[in-house]
UniProtKB/Swiss-Prot annotation:
Phosphoserine: modified positions: S233, S234
Processing after translation: Phosphorylated.
Family matches, as Gene3D superfamilies: 1.20.5.2650
One BP term from GO: translation
Keywords attached to this entry: Phosphoprotein, Ribonucleoprotein, Ribosomal protein
GO cellular component: ribonucleoprotein complex; ribosome
Bias (Basic and acidic residues): 219-229
UniProt name for this protein: Small ribosomal subunit protein eS6
Transmembrane segments: none
GO molecular function (one): structural constituent of ribosome
């Protein structure tokens, strides 16, 4: 079984081929997301704690979180499911996936170092791979450099050097997202003003309608009163004639 070990703290990754199956038996019957003490792998892993993140079996089928089974199963998967990428809107497909319980059928097991042990592992904890890209969002840049809201974020953007095929070198920086600029503030103020105007116009229209409705109701009442008066006078005239 191959063991794909990642160390996110230093951005390194290493694949170790373990031919003796007895050495990896400590992972059997464990589930994805479970943390395992890795002392059984050898002296170099003494004190290390590894978290199981996934794996593939010998036919290449991936492990799926939430499927409580040590073997392969066929599931009807949709757009939001892991282990499946839908090509069309609303498409679903029955796919073979492996359960989240580790068994001897796996060819590759992916783990992450949660706690470092006593000894260093060559090529994993001894090296540091810097991140290729820095943060892009304004708040994340502020958090990285401990900036206040008054500081200009644009001066702290992490730039990287890019070399073209012709050998020319230039620096490249990401476009800062969610950056508060005078233009953005003016746009927000404009939208707010438009909203206030719309609310006021709606209130004015409602008041005008209520006034018109009251006028119509009053007119109808007066018409009814006039009709009633006319009828009463005509009845009085008829009774006098009789």
């Amino acid at each position: 079984m191959k063991l794909n070990i990642a160390y996110p703290a230093q951005g390194t990754q290493k694949c170790i081929d373990i031919e003796d199956e007895h050495r990896v038996r400590g992972f059997y019957e464990k589930r994805m997301g479970q943390e395992v003490e890795a002392d059984f792998l050898g002296d170099e892993f003494k004190g290390y704690v590894l978290k199981i993140t996934g794996g593939n079996d010998k036919q290449g089928f991936p492990m799926k979180q939430g499927v409580m089974h040590p073997t392969r199963v066929r599931l009807l998967l949709s757009k939001d499911s892991s282990c499946y990428r839908s090509r069309r809107a609303g498409e679903r497909k029955r796919k073979s996936v492996r359960g989240c319980i580790v068994s001897s059928d796996l060819s590759v097991l992916s783990v992450v170092i949660v706690k470092q042990g006593d000894a260093d592992i060559e090529g994993l904890t001894t090296e540091t791979v810097p991140r290729r890209l820095g943060p892009k969002r304004a708040n994340n840049i502020r958090k990285l450099f401990a900036l206040s809201k008054e500081d200009d974020v644009r001066q702290y953007v992490i730039r990287r050097e890019v070399t073209t095929k012709s050998g020319k070198t230039y620096t490249k920086a990401p476009k800062i997202q969610r950056l508060i600029t005078p233009r953005r503030l003016a746009h927000k103020a404009q939208l707010r003003e438009k909203k206030v105007k719309a609310i006021q116009a709606s209130k004015d229209a409602a008041a005008e309608y209520a006034q018109l409705l009251a006028k119509r109701v009053a007119e109808k009442k007066s018409e009814k009163a006039e009709e009633k008066k006319r009828r009463a006078s005509s009845l009085r005239t008829q009774s006098v004639q009789a």
